[in-house]
Amino acid sequence: MRRLIGFCVVLWIGIALQAQSLYPDFSKMNFGCDGNSITAGEQWSKTVVDLLGFATHHNVAVGSATWACHSDTQDYGSAGFAGISGGWRPTEDSHELQMRHNNVSKVHIQKFIAEVENGQYPVPDVFVFSMGTNDKNLGSAEESLKGKTLAEVDVTTMAGGARWAIQTILEHYPKCRVFVCTPIQTGDVTRNERNLEKIAILREICRA
């Protein structure tokens, strides 16, 4: 994971500053991203792609997503895989609950890689993660970085899920420039204090 990972708050500015010096022609670059509701669909990432003129836009973000997995999260494409849901309203539907438990970065990244490998999308030149707002079980950067392999990482914590997702993208696409965007400020003081904890964890993981 010892590769350059940028933190950007103003997303398109961050990407432009890092990428322009190496890739002045964005029309030859492919853009990928993962995140939660503020990234899902054609929101800021679509604006980035359009303004800078990226060749492709591969977005696997889903609303309500977290870095952390659940104890019953399924691998993407595994036997009996239920799918992914961004639902958040109360429900007792077991299939819907399983799909919600699959709405995590690990599964999103498995989906992203599968779609590249089957030819739906090209290998990314730039990849942006923008999530963490919905995470509750933070864990610690120190614990998440102890394992030598990703199989040893506890992905049921935000820290572990983040390490798994970021490192997996870097290992699969070593030439890709990866950016990690931290949770945005809110009008809630308590929530902002919690976000500062998340930011510190993500920063430490990215510097490892």
Which residue stretches match the model-derived regions?
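Substrate-gating cap/lid alpha-helix
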Residues: 168, 179-208
